[in-house]
Swiss-Prot record:
A motif (Q motif) lies at residues 14-42. GO terms for cellular component: nucleolus. It comes from Aspergillus fumigatus (strain ATCC MYA-4609 / CBS 101355 / FGSC A1100 / Af293). Residues 521-629 form a coiled coil. Residues 283-437 form the Helicase C-terminal domain. It comes from the Eukaryota. Its EC number is 3.6.4.13. Residues 45-249 form the Helicase ATP-binding domain. It is found in: Nucleus, Nucleolus. Keywords: ATP-binding, Coiled coil, Helicase, Hydrolase, Nucleotide-binding, Nucleus, Ribosome biogenesis, RNA-binding, rRNA processing. Residues 531-593, 607-640 are annotated as: Disordered. Residues 630-640 have a biased composition (Acidic residues). ATP binds at A58, V59, T60, G61, S62, G63, K64, T65. This is ATP-dependent rRNA helicase spb4.
Length: 640
């Protein structure tokens, strides 16, 4: 039985943890402003430190990161001897680059209070003040951050060989790259702990194969921790990641009735606003202006990357100069994502991050005051994660989800059943058709100035419709209920896109616009020149009726049916090829078959040998400070 804390000591005091935390950890918590543990930390840290596998489900913003970082650090610093060179003691896996970076930064901040680790992480330069030196036998924690897009796998391996880190913080794809090297070791004698942060997303089918390949390279005798805001929805998959009799920790929030009925922080107020489609974007200015004091950090969530690209050009015109709008989505280049993320984090003026669900999970964006879900998420699980960007660590926050009148209002009851209740937005906001018309005119003025923006709008609208049609709550979000003309005008479109979903639409597809499309130009001179050339070529050659009919026939097929047709063709092609190979094999003599098998075996062995030699050459070259030629590795783009 664990000893009880001294009389008068709060169970959530850092010095009440059993087994006791190191003095330098207590000093770090005090210096970082954490006066006492959060409920999830008070529950999870003692269990994880006591060699238990843990499954931790707690509301977003509840301090889960320190719940696993402190046990990992304490475990590695209490070993009998240092971990061997090029051996790994702990791994922390995150679904996104941004979240992995934040975990690494928190870990580095913590280790700054442990002199041996701090010296290993940031060795002194010639012009720096001399740092104390520690013998090689001194226990220390040396982390390495692995991110696709910022470094190549060869550079990661070179850093690993040079610094010999014992803790890896990584996204799944880049981690698997490193663990595939024969120079990286995770034997049972060295490896201690595995942490899966945002575990339900890591256990999603999209990451299943990568995760399984990683787990095959790790010893089964280890401590494993799963941390997330909604672990319960992935519990049936926990066995697959090798937990042994895990202890489940669930930390919920009491609602007004005093019953544990909420899955979000008590400091977060979740609301909804019902607005007609034509007023949707015009309402955004009213929302951010009505919140007092003015929110310094706001996040707007939309459903698609194309939507971010288009609305990042339109919304600043509607919001005015009072807010800095910054786009962020998963298809941005890694350096662009990091740059925009840092701009938002470091902005001293009111800023709005326009993003997709790439920013909905795990990111600890400090001081977010307001979250607006312009598009309700296709996956209801994402709703809680989006809202949870505000109201973190006890800070007051507000979230608003925009709904169309009618059937979409049933989403309120749907959320109530899922224990994420929302209340009407207050103060109430009134709209007029004149406000909506003015917003449409402002957006269209920008679109008319550049045909490229029109193209982006058409693409974004189609992309939004596809996402809308995939809502898991399909009985609430129905394409057949959409008001096409109102939506098109709200988006600032000059016409509705050609979509099979509009095949039976009898309204005004031009949205009341009359435009000379032949003379509607791109701002980019090269692009406009090319458009005119194509227009001239089409006029001179003339499109044949059969070609025109064929194109129209293709357009009349829904995008989902087109994708299904392509998949069927590919499957038939593969089946045909397989039959041909089988027939050729059956015609061979036994001697011929044996020769083929021997040849294939030799080719495979040679391929593996060459690949290993290339990996080794690159690693050695990088370790020596040289740049290996032909080292153009594909960058891992992360998860969206």
């Amino acid at each position: 039985m664990a000893p009880k804390p001294p009389s008068g000591t709060s169970l959530r005091a850092w010095d009440a943890v059993t087994p006791a935390l190191s003095e330098w950890v207590l000093e770090a918590m005090s210096s970082m402003g954490f006066t006492r543990m959060t409920p999830v930390q008070a529950s999870a840290i003692p269990l994880f430190m006591a060699h238990k596998d843990v499954v931790v489900e707690a509301v977003t913003g509840s301090g889960k990161t320190l719940s696993f970082l402190i046990p990992v650090v304490e475990k590695l610093l209490r070993l009998e001897e240092p971990i061997k060179k090029h051996h790994v003691g702990a791994i922390i896996i995150s679904p996104t680059r941004e979240l992995a970076s934040q975990i690494y930064n928190v870990l580095s901040s913590l280790l700054a209070f442990h002199p041996p680790s701090a010296a290993a992480i940031n060795p002194s330069e010639d012009d720096d003040a001399p740092r104390p030196k520690f013998p090689s036998s001194t226990l220390k924690v040396v982390p390495q951050l692995l991110l696709g897009g910022s470094t190549t796998p060869a550079e990661d391996l070179s850093t690993f060989l040079k610094r010999s880190p014992n803790v890896l913080v990584s996204t799944p794809g880049r981690l698997l790259e490193l663990l595939s090297s024969p120079h990286v070791h995770c034997p049972q004698s060295s490896f201690e702990m595995l942490v899966l942060d945002e575990a339900d997303r890591l256990l999603d089918l999209g990451f299943k194969e990568t995760l399984q390949n990683i787990l095959r390279r790790l010893p089964k005798q280890r401590r494993t921790g799963l941390f997330s805001a909604s672990v319960s929805e992935a519990v049936d998959q926990i066995v697959r990641v090798g937990l042994r009799n895990p202890v489940k920790v669930m930390v919920k929030v009491k609602g007004g009735s005093g019953v544990d009925d909420k899955r979000t922080p008590a400091s977060l107020q979740m609301t909804y606003l019902t607005t007609p489609p034509s007023h949707k974007f015009a309402a955004l200015k009213r929302i951010v202006s009505s919140v007092q004091p003015t929110p310094l950090k706001t996040i707007f969530f939309v459903s698609t990357c194309s939507g971010v690209d288009y609305l990042s050009a339109i919304l600043p015109l509607l919001l005015g100069d009072d807010f800095l709008l910054i786009p962020l989505h998963g298809k941005h280049q890694a350096n662009v994502r990091q740059k925009n993320f840092n701009r938002f984090i470091n902005s001293h003026d009111p800023a709005i991050l326009l993003t997709t669900d790439v920013a909905a999970r795990g990111l600890d964006i400090p001081s977010v005051d307001l979250v607006v879900q312009i598009d309700p998420p296709s996956d209801p699980k994402s709703f809680i994660h989006r809202c949870g960007r505000a109201g973190r660590a006890g800070r007051r926050g507000l979230s608003v989800v925009l709904l169309h009148p009618g059937r979409e209002e049933d989403y309120v009851s749907f959320l109530e059943v899922r224990k994420t209740p929302v209340v009407p937005f207050s103060p109430s906001i009134s709209f007029s058709d004149a406000d909506a018309a003015a917003a449409t005119a402002t957006a269209r003025k920008a679109v008319l100035a550049d045909r490229a923006l029109h193209d982006r709008g058409q693409k974004a609208f189609v992309s939004w419709l596809r996402s809308y049609s995939k809502h898991q709550a399909s009985s609430i979000f129905r394409v057949s209920d959409l008001d096409w003309e109102a939506l098109g005008k709200a988006w600032g479109l000059l016409k509705l896109p050609k979509m099979p979903e509009l095949k039976n639409f009898t309204g005004d597809k031009t949205l009341g616009m009359s435009l000379d499309w032949d003379n509607y130009a791109y701002k980019d001179k090269q692009r406009e020149k090319r458009r005119k050339e194509l227009l001239q070529e089409a006029a001179e050659s003339g499109a044949t009726q059969s070609t025109s009919n064929k194109r129209r026939a293709t357009e009349s097929v829904a995008w989902s049916q087109q994708a299904e047709s392509k998949n069927k063709k590919l499957k038939r092609r593969e089946q045909k090829k397989s039959k041909q190979e089988k027939a050729r094999w059956e015609k061979m003599t036994e001697e011929e078959k044996q020769k083929v098998l021997e040849t294939e075996k030799m080719v495979e062995e040679l391929r593996k040998k060459n690949e290993e030699e290339r990996r080794l050459r690159r690693a050695v070259a990088k370790a020596a400070g040289a740049k290996a030629d032909g080292d153009d590795e594909e960058e891992f783009q992360g998860f969206d």
